[in-house]
């Protein structure tokens, strides 16, 4: 493969994580060889957060119904904060090459599972970030009872991106970190706005115009 020129930030990340990333991706490849029937499942999981679009659609649908409107607003806010943080700021700043571009072995593993090329940088994982944005915001709106399901979805999304060899494990890890952070930030902002709205509503009801 041709030599890849790394940005200073991408070079630091590769120096820190590549050796371990490679070993973990090798394990995923071994699992894909042993259990090829899992690959279509991983593709399906991955598609639920493709460009964040399915999750954006889910949020908008929830907003359309009074019973789920509050949840939809939280989720859409989480996705928005996460997209700005990861897709607008961090990814263009780091510009870490995809693993299948950087390493010949990983490229052969990527070819084996039939993955497609991705158009943006590898660090952090946008799919995992979106899954975490959405899930944390959903839990923020609905309480702790959904936390186990949120954790399961976030973890499965990260696994799917590694299984398909389109992200390093470190990309996924930081996608989770950024996504969880964005979800909490969005949840706090939306909760603040709701409180202010309720306060104004209470004041208005207590002092109706005569």
Task: Put a short name on every predicted segment.
Residues 44, 74-81, 173-176:
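Loop-to-helix transition at the N-terminal end of transmembrane alpha-helices
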Residues 35-37, 67-72, 142-149:
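Membrane-helix interface segments
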Residues 108-210:
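Membrane-embedded catalytic cores of phosphoryl/pyrophosphoryl-handling enzymes
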Residues 61, 81, 85-90, 94, ...:
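Alpha-helical membrane-inserting segments
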Residues 65-66, 94-95, 164-168:
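Short helix-capping/hinge motifs at transmembrane helix termini and TM-loop junctions
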Residues 1-55, 87-117, 208:
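N-terminal transmembrane-helix/juxtamembrane module of multi-pass inner/ER membrane proteins
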Residues 57-86:
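Interfacial segments of alpha-helical transmembrane regions
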């Amino acid at each position: 493969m041709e030599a890849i020129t790394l940005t200073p930030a991408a070079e630091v990340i590769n120096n820190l994580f590549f050796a371990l990333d490679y070993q973990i991706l090798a394990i995923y490849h071994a699992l894909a060889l042993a259990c090829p029937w899992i690959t279509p499942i991983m593709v399906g999981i991955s598609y639920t957060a493709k460009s964040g679009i399915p999750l954006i659609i889910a949020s908008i649908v929830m907003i359309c119904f009074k019973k789920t409107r509050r949840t939809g607003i939280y989720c859409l806010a989480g996705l928005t904060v996460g997209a700005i943080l990861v897709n607008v700021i961090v990814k263009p700043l780091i510009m870490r090459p995809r693993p299948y571009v950087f390493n010949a072995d990983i490229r052969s593993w990527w070819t084996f599972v039939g993955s497609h090329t991705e158009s943006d940088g590898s660090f952090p994982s946008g799919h995992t970030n979106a899954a975490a944005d959405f899930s944390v915001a959903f839990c923020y709106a609905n309480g702790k009872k959904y936390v186990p399901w949120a954790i399961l979805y976030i973890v499965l999304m990260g696994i799917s991106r590694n299984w398909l060899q389109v992200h390093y494990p470190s990309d996924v890890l930081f996608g989770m970190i950024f996504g969880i952070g964005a979800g909490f930030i969005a949840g706090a902002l939306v909760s603040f706005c709701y409180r202010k709205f309720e306060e104004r509503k209470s004041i208005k009801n207590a002092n109706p115009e005569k």
